[in-house]
């Protein structure tokens, strides 16, 4: 099993301890040799050589530590750059997600449009038919009055004579006695609507006509007034009868 290599810090601490021990031995040896005036040749030289050797190793290790310090500073700068790049990558990833969502939506809408186009091509209608249909609508004046319309013009949007005869007033004049001359159903008037026989038959007949009905106690008078001749018609009839009687007497 391989022994793990010591770090630079541990090696420096070990060398410093050795230097400290050697320095103490040198100092103690020199102190003893002076006090006792005893000197053993070669002992101080060995300690000094060992001290110089340890100092050389310490200097070499300090160079290594200095280079490692520079490397550590470079690593810190690179770590900051990596963090910045990582933030840029995350931002770009977010933008790519948004672009993916937009593209997916656009692709879905494009597919739906293609389906609509295919469906329209399968059920295509010629432009001539559209023009004919538009001409029919404009010619019948179903949506607006003619440009040359004047009061008295029977054309639309006012109802024609046939539509008037088929409408509410025409039906009221042709109803049987028990259906019109009597009182209208109370529930119909209470609900504010006309009976089914008097319901409007055309779109131009407004439903407001049923809302303008009088109360039940006045319905008979309202119907009789609407069905009966007015004062001007009575005077015209009297004048015509007088003229006819005078002409017959003259002929006699």
Swiss-Prot record:
InterPro entries associated with the record: Mediator_Med4
Provenance organism: Xenopus laevis (African clawed frog)
Family designation: Belongs to the Mediator complex subunit 4 family.
GO cellular component term of the entry, any: mediator complex
GO biological process, one term: regulation of transcription by RNA polymerase II
GO MF entries: transcription coregulator activity
Location in or out of the cell: Nucleus
Stretches of the chain forming a coiled coil according to its record: 5-31, 70-112
Compositional bias (Low complexity): 241-252
Keyword Cell cycle included in the entry's annotation: no
Subunit structure comment from the entry: Component of the Mediator complex.
Entry protein name: Mediator of RNA polymerase II transcription subunit 4
Region (Disordered): 213-252
């Amino acid at each position: 099993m391989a022994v793990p290599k010591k770090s630079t810090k541990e090696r420096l601490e070990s060398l410093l301890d050795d230097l400290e021990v050697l320095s103490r031995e040198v100092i103690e040896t020199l102190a003893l040799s002076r006090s006792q005036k005893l000197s053993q040749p070669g002992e101080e030289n060995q300690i000094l050589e060992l001290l110089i050797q340890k100092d050389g190793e310490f200097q070499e290790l300090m160079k290594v530590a200095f280079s490692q310090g520079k490397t550590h500073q470079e690593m810190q700068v690179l770590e900051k750059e990596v963090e910045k790049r990582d933030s840029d990558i995350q931002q770009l990833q977010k933008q790519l997600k948004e672009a993916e969502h937009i593209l997916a939506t656009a692709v879905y809408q494009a597919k739906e449009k293609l389906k609509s186009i295919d469906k329209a091509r399968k059920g295509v209608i010629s432009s001539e038919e559209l023009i004919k249909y538009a001409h029919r609508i404009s010619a019948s004046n179903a949506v607006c009055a003619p440009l040359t319309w004047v009061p008295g013009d029977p054309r639309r949007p006012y109802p024609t004579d046939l539509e008037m005869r088929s409408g509410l007033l025409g039906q009221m004049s042709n109803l049987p006695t028990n259906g019109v001359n009597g009182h209208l159903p109370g529930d119909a008037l209470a609900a504010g609507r006309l009976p089914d026989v008097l319901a409007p038959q055309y779109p131009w007949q407004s439903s407001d006509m049923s809302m303008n009905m009088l109360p039940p106690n006045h319905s008979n008078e309202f119907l009789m007034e609407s069905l009966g001749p007015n004062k001007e018609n009575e005077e015209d009839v009297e004048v015509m009868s007088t003229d006819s009687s005078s002409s017959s007497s003259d002929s006699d």
